Amino acid sequence: MEEFFQQLTNGLAVGGIYALIALGYTMVYGVLKLINFAHGDLFTIGAFLGLTLLTSLGLTDAIGPVAGLILLAVMVVILVGVVGFLLERIAYRPLRTSPRLSAVVSALGASIFFQNAIMLIWGARPLVYPHGLLPNITVSILGVELPLIRILMFAISVVLMCALYYLTHKTRIGTAIRAAAIDQGAAKLMGIDVNRVISLVFMIGPALGGAAGVMVGLYYGQISFTMGWLYGLKAFTAAILGGIGNIPGAMLGGLLLGVVESLGAAYISIAWKDAISFLVLILILIVRPTGLLGERVADKV
C-alpha cells in the first residue's frame, strides 16, 4: 500500500506538469483550431531560462530558497510569455487566412528554429540544475514519507490550474477568450478584439509551459534541448485524453496520464513507461475520440 501511495503521488506531481503544458495546447486549439507544434520547445526554453537566471542572479542566496524560486518562476513565466507573443505575431498571425497546412508547416518550422536556437545558446549537452536548493526533507502523509519537492510541485501545479480556471471562467478577459473560442465572427460583432485575445492566449499557454519547465529542472535536475519533444507529445496526449479545446479536460487528462504512467512503470515495467502513455492515447481515440470531457459530435441527417 505504501508503494502504491508513493507511485500515486509521484504520478500526480508529474501529471501536474503534463497538465500545465497541455493547457497551452488546448487554449490555442480552442481559439484557433490549430495545434501549436512549437509549444513543447517553449517549455524547454522555460527550463533553460530558469537555469540561466538561477545561476547568474543568485536569487536563492540573496533572498532565500523559497522566495528566490518563486521570483525565478515569475521571471520565467513573463519571459516565456513574451516569446509566445512574438511567436504568434511572427509565425502564425500572417498565415491566419492561409490554408491550414501553411500554419502547420510554420509551427513545425518554429519548433526546429527553437531547438537549434537553444542548442546554439546553451549547447547540445544536457545541463544540470544546482542541487540542494530546497531542504531535503520528507513530509508524512497517512503514514507515508513523501519528498517535500514532490508535494510542492503538485501544489504549485494545482494553484496555477485553479488560477487559470478562475481567469477563464470568472473574469471579463476569460469571457472574451471563451467567446472567441466559440465563434470569432460573433465575438467581433460583440466588440471583442479577437487579435488581442489570440495574443493573450499565446502568452498564457507558453507562460504555464515555462513554469512547468522550471519545475522539471528542479525535480529531475537535468535538462536538454530536445526534452520538449517528449514532454510536448505527452502533454498533447493529455489534452486529447481530457478533450482538446477543453481547459478542465486538459487538467484532468494531465493528472490521469501522470498517474497511469507512474503506476504502469512501477507495476509493469519502467521500460514500458512511455509506451503506456501512448497506448492510453490510442485507446481513448478508439473509445471516445472527443476525450473524457469533450463534447460528442454528431451529424444530423
Positions of predicted regions on the chain:
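Inter-helical junctions in multi-pass inner-membrane proteins, predominant
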Residues: 2-17, 167-168, 172, 198-239, ...
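Hydrophobic alpha-helical segments within and immediately flanking transmembrane helices
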Residues: 14-25, 38-59, 87, 105-106, ...
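Helix-loop-helix "hairpin" substructures at the membrane interface of multi-pass membrane proteins
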Residues: 14, 145-223, 247-253
